[in-house]
From Swiss-Prot:
<keyword id="KW-0687">Ribonucleoprotein</keyword>
<dbReference type="GO" id="GO:0003735">
    <property type="term" value="F:structural constituent of ribosome"/>
</dbReference>
<dbReference type="GO" id="GO:0006412">
    <property type="term" value="P:translation"/>
</dbReference>
<dbReference type="InterPro" id="IPR018254">
    <property type="entry name" value="Ribosomal_uL29_CS"/>
</dbReference>
<comment type="similarity">
    <text>Belongs to the universal ribosomal protein uL29 family.</text>
</comment>
<keyword id="KW-0689">Ribosomal protein</keyword>
<dbReference type="InterPro" id="IPR036049">
    <property type="entry name" value="Ribosomal_uL29_sf"/>
</dbReference>
<dbReference type="GO" id="GO:0022625">
    <property type="term" value="C:cytosolic large ribosomal subunit"/>
</dbReference>
<dbReference type="InterPro" id="IPR050063">
    <property type="entry name" value="Ribosomal_protein_uL29"/>
</dbReference>
<protein>
    <recommendedName>
        <fullName>Large ribosomal subunit protein uL29</fullName>
    </recommendedName>
</protein>
<dbReference type="InterPro" id="IPR001854">
    <property type="entry name" value="Ribosomal_uL29"/>
</dbReference>
<dbReference type="Pfam" id="PF00831">
    <property type="entry name" value="Ribosomal_L29"/>
</dbReference>
Length: 63
C-alpha cells in the first residue's frame, strides 16, 4: 500500500484501514506460530503498512 493512496483518505477511513490491518497481522502471527505461513515477508509488509497508517493519523491529528 502506497502512502499516496493513504493520504487521500480521511481519518475515519484510515481508522477502518488500521483495524483491518491489525486483524490481518493477528491472523498472520497465528499462522506463523502454527507454521502454516509460507511467505513470512507478508508479516513485515503488514507491519509497515500499519506504521504508515498510524503516521498519517498522527499527521492529520496535528493539523
Amino acid at each position: 500500500m502506497k502512502a499516496s493512496e493513504l493520504r487521500s483518505k480521511d481519518a475515519a477511513e484510515l481508522g477502518k484501514e488500521l483495524e483491518s490491518l491489525l486483524k490481518a497481522q493477528f491472523g498472520l502471527r497465528m499462522q506463523k506460530a502454527t507454521q502454516q505461513l509460507a511467505n513470512t515477508s507478508q508479516l513485515r509488509n503488514v507491519r509497515r503498512d500499519i506504521a504508515r497508517v498510524r503516521t498519517l493519523l498522527t499527521e492529520k491529528a496535528g493539523k
